[in-house]
Amino acid sequence: MFDKKAIEFLKNLTESFGPSGFEREPAGIVKEYMKSYSDDVVMDKLGSIVFVAKGQAEKPRVLLAGHIDEVGFVVSGIDENSGFLTFNPVGGWWDQVLLSQKVVIRTAKGDVQGVIA
């Protein structure tokens, strides 16, 4: 029913780490997946990826555009006694949907799983 390659791509993409300013991981996943569907792939210094699929006719042309980053947060404080973190959003976020959200905190020593409470 569904293309297994497409399902695996979406799984890898949604599980990748890509908040604003750190889009390299999801960009690499998209680039790898799309190269088999494109005649040309260009990635600029800012991380934008352009895929070109050449058609047979001059018109019409279609542009599909989107962003590759996800909403993230920056840790702004750590309570040494409880281990609770305070944080500020990077990008837009709806405060009312934060409770019970699973998060990944990327540190110099590796990723840490957490839940917003």
PLM ranges: what are they?
Residues 1-117:
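N-terminal hydrophobic/helix-forming segments and targeting peptides
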